[in-house]
Amino acid sequence: MKLLTTGLLASAALVAAQEQQVLRADEVFGKAPLPDASIFDETIKQFQSSIEDGISHFWSEMKTNFKDYLPMISLPKKHNRRPDSEWDHVVRGADVESVWVQGADGEKRREIDGKLKNYDLRVKSVDPSQLGIDPGVKQYSGYLDDNDADKHLFYWFFESRNDPKNDPVVLWLNGGPGCSSLTGLFLELGPATIDKNLKVVHNPYSWNSNASVIFLDQPVNVGFSYSGSSVSDTVAAGKDVYALLTLFFKQFPEYATQDFHISGESYAGHYIPVFAAEILSHKNTNINLKSALIGNGLTDPLTQYPHYRPMACGDGGYPAVLDQGTCRSMDNSLERCLSLIETCYSSESAWVCVPAAMYCNSAILAPYQQTGMNPYDVRSKCEDMGSLCYPQLNAITEWLNQKSVMKALGVEVESYESCNSGINRDFLFHGDWMKPFHRLVPSVLEKIPVLIYAGDADFICNWLGNQAWTEALEWPGHKKFTEAKLQDLKIVDNKNKGKKIGQVKSSGNFTFMRIFGAGHMVPLNQPEASLEFFNRWLRGEWH
């Protein structure tokens, strides 16, 4: 769904602990027992001798104040795996990997590239009448299994409402990291939402209006996914996504011939460059990747972090949330923040990337969160921090936890939660947050178009920062893209033709959009506008 603020809380907590030396870690991270970190003492001691004073001091404070939380891992979910006989289809990765064909040069090669032998895909045909979601629309759910690593990723597929034999296929990924893509399904762009009475409500602006959509709960231990192990960085998750798509299209070759697009929001700004690059790295594949879409993403922190102060202090098109004194304090902290991020970019080591995330989030992002305003929409207060400021999530979570729903989908875990804060901490404490995944975008742009869109009322991944990193990105089309002017984006597809919904600039394979009146989740706040640009993008406009 969104960039979780758990990282901000952890960062702010560390700063408070440095000042007061009284803050208890269990009050910040919860009371679940975790392994003792004494094994890290010697490692940290040795490392401190080779790093700069600021970073060394940070790790000393971490070891003192959060000793029990350094070896952070997300806890496994209770689950009960169903036998293969209860599934409608089971696709063996080993079978796919064993198929060889003769190429045009007469040489034998594998039909499909990639390390697939450890993966299986289990498929259940979902009866729409049981759930009341899009009756008449074909649906599948199931799990991608990495049997060696004991990882099981849940997915839910909805065929296009329009022309499934010809319409493209889209993968949707929520962010967090650690938020279920089913939040995107029911809160934003899927075929239905859930009201406060737990009734299914049809969504006329669903993205499966003209495309088939796969919603994937990843990484493991998110949503209905589960594992006895954990994934704590973006790159590891990329291999799983490639395997899922490969086996899905192998089972359903009728979709493999159609255009495929990968999309997502928030921390998917990390995921999508990696996942797209992984897919494009394979020469022989059944994934017909045509474009990538990132909404309100975190992709290039070094370029994006300077734009938090302007967005919070009245320079982003909305009234200031913070007072002038707090804004000056953020300005004063920025130089050190950027220096830490630059060091992270140079080494990409957790030892330096974690301090960058902790310091920058506490100094640059946390002041906004402490106001009680919604970090995902500067126009409103946070109604319920427990539901990430969106109380609608409570009904969605309750509906998905019904035994009848779980049975209809073939779910193997005991419960569902919209976001797993443990996953968020895993990624944060492994240094993933600040890594420069934007460096993969130029190679992606060489092969496919990329759309960066941003609701202009979001703070946490705001439009100022997203426009800035797209214009700063070094790639062959940089000069022309930077010189391109923002043009009005208007509706052309329905009765509201001519209505202004945002601004767009495009050159070559790169496009940036600012969507008016939308927060972090554009399809939630502006469903008509989101379906408008989505359909036009899939048709090839702007690229």
From Swiss-Prot:
It is found in: Vacuole. GO terms for cellular component: fungal-type vacuole. Residues 18-124 form a propeptide. Keywords: Carboxypeptidase, Disulfide bond, Glycoprotein, Hydrolase, Protease, Signal, Vacuole, Zymogen. Its EC number is 3.4.16.5. Disulfide bonds join C179-C419, C313-C327, C337-C360, C344-C353, C382-C389. It comes from the Eukaryota. Transmembrane segments: none annotated. It catalyses: Release of a C-terminal amino acid with broad specificity. GO terms for biological process: proteolysis. One of its GO terms (molecular function) is serine-type carboxypeptidase activity. PROSITE patterns: CARBOXYPEPT_SER_SER (PS00131). This is Carboxypeptidase Y homolog A. It comes from Arthroderma gypseum (strain ATCC MYA-4604 / CBS 118893) (Microsporum gypseum).
